[in-house]
Amino acid sequence: MRVIRPVEHADIAALMQLAGKTGGGLTSLPANEATLAARIERALKTWSDELPKGEQGYVFVLEDSETGEVGGICAIEVAVGLNDPWYNYRVGTLVHASKELNVYNALPTLFLSNDHTGSSELCTLFLDPEWRKEGNGYLLSKSRFMFMAAFRDKFNEKVVAEMRGVIDEHGYSPFWQSLGKRFFSMDFSRADFLCGTGQKAFIAELMPKHPIYTHFLSEEAQAVIGEVHPQTAPARAVLEKEGFRYRHYIDIFDGGPTLECDIDRVRAIRKSRLVEVAEGQPAPGDYPACLVANENYHHFRAALVRADPQTSRLVLTAAQLDALKCRAGDHVRLVRLCAEEKTV
């Protein structure tokens, strides 16, 4: 059974393997053992309530409960930008007009922004290519909503998610090549690595402070503003079906879109509910895939089951109960996996 659980120190080797498969562009999962070890330590200190809000971040892994193999990672930052500034470009408009000359130009413009400061962030979503089947991607992404619903007071009103922008297999980013490289004087991969390993001071020091007309960028760069990497398109679709929207904020490095939603408007959070769990053999029937999660903060578990999403009493097998770290009589959180049926 595939389950979501909190990260542990022993996961470092598995995370290094995952980091090596990202192909670059996933800033928060660099192939750097010291950085990943520090990330694990920060997550564990978050669970033990040892950190201020601006440093808190939860990390989860997707594990095969029978073999112990890890095939995916996902994370939540509690409040971004409270320690280091959190930058986006806001894609806006500047108008230049002259009645005398009968000229009117509305020009798309990039404005440096810290508007999402304090928001909670969904981040570091990566699934091993060999695990991209049987609903694993949905479980990995949406399990975070079950955790947020259970421990709502830990998170802020707005939730954001930076989506990976357009980068080719050689690490070439059209947006970076046309804009960022002119100010940072380094390749995209170098800037991405520095940011991913926590060396972010250079961003504030070298970022252009004035609005930038997108017409000054190459046509290739203009075309990728707000667009996602092909491998990220499914993740974007998942979030949009949960209520997330693109509000014209983009990543300063690759131009990928930032999606956002009020936390209480996220479908899986809004519609999830607590039901009593019993041990037994689930009744046969053509039931939809559902997310189920325990309410244990330190030993959180989430998985997929076939069930009636409207049931008041969820029957699970002994193996399912064991994987979810719960017992008969406990209450678990349940919600339909998708607004529309998704076969897994």
UniProtKB/Swiss-Prot annotation:
Alphabetical GO biological process terms: arginine catabolic process to glutamate; arginine catabolic process to succinate
Aminoacyl-tRNA synthetase found in the keyword field: no
Binding site for succinyl-CoA: 125
Pathway(s) the chain acts in: Amino-acid degradation; L-arginine degradation via AST pathway; L-glutamate and succinate from L-arginine: step 1/5
Any GO molecular function: arginine N-succinyltransferase activity
Superkingdom assignment: Bacteria
Classification via SUPFAM superfamilies: Acyl-CoA N-acyltransferases (Nat)
InterPro entries with a match to the protein in the record: Acyl_CoA_acyltransferase, Arg_succinylTrfase_AstA/AruG, Arginine_N-succinylTrfase
Catalysed reactions listed for this entry: succinyl-CoA + L-arginine = N(2)-succinyl-L-arginine + CoA + H(+)
Swiss-Prot/TrEMBL keywords: Acyltransferase, Arginine metabolism, Transferase
EC number(s) from the headed UniProt entry: 2.3.1.109
Active site, renumbered: 229
Role summary: Catalyzes the transfer of succinyl-CoA to arginine to produce N(2)-succinylarginine.
UniProt name for this protein: Arginine N-succinyltransferase
